[in-house]
Amino acid sequence: MNNLKGYAIANDGNMKRIAITYDVIDDETGKPTALNKKTNMFITDASVLETIRQIDAFAQGIIDNQ
């Protein structure tokens, strides 16, 4: 089983990229077999990009009102 530990969304030129950190857990023992594994990829799914745009607008609204 893969246990998501965290992720970050970043601008990379005109694209959005997601960086993910996770642990691999043995299904039978429940013990970790690999810690802090990382992967990243460009986000191309339109619905995911729209969700990110909404979160970006929310975050911008917070700092605009500080």
Regions found by a protein language model. Name each.
Residues 2-6, 31-66:
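Acidic, low-complexity intrinsically disordered segments
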